[in-house]
Amino acid sequence: MLKIERPNFIEIGVGDYTEANTRFIYDRFYPKGIIIDSEKDLKKKVLSNINYWKGDLIILEERISSENINNIISKNCDFSIDIFSLDIDGIDYWIINKLKTNISKIFVAEYNAVFGASLEVTTPNLKNFDRKEYHYSHLCFGVSLKALINIMVKKNYYFIGTNSARNNAFFISNDYPIDKYFKNLKIEDINYYVDSNIRESRDIEGNLNYLSK
């Protein structure tokens, strides 16, 4: 549909790469990609759970900021990006704000459903932001869906929906117009996409207390 035969990707925020958004792509399509995370001993951990021969994968142990993101990409990326995925539980909005317009065909970004449907909010652009340290609940992180959609519109993308967990939003470059490529797509009211059942809140002592809203 989007003329992608063997997806090239960049994913920021992958942990040890066992649950990353591009993991299936790497295993299935033998692609070229870059994964970035601040996880200690990242390359060792990733190599322990993938077949490294399956693709041309660059593994970067870096803490991404709005100041270094473009430099890191320009230094390491020598290919056209089909899929860009971002999930760092923090200053995601400010990273997107610094990215060049239309950086990829498909863009996947985490959002915080706890912020609700009407608020256009994000966390402050703090160096070394850590959701666990910023607020004991662990719930103040990332960006609201409304704010994410609006910044992505400025970056020349349109919204096509989310995953069923209601924490990852999907966007398509306007180079692939919705009336041509997704003409039968139905976009629900934004309230639908923030109705999440994920319960990862903590009490002041750091224990999970499973608040739903």
What are these regions (language model features)?
Residues 1-10, 18, 24, 29, ...:
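Rossmann-like AdoMet/SAM-dependent catalytic core
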Residues 1-75, 79, 83-86, 113-116, ...:
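SAM cofactor-binding core of SAM-dependent methyltransferases
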Residues 11, 35, 85, 106-110, ...:
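A structural signal for short, well-ordered beta-strand segments and their strand-loop junctions
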Residues 30-31, 38, 104, 156-158:
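Short aromatic/hydrophobic-glycine micro-motifs
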Residues 41, 90-91, 166:
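Short alpha-helical
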Residues 46, 73, 95-99, 171:
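Hydrophobic packing residues within well-ordered alpha-helices of enzyme cores
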Residues 56, 94-133:
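A short alpha/beta connector and helix-capping loop motif
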Residues 85-95:
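Active-site glycine- and acidic-residue-rich loops that bind
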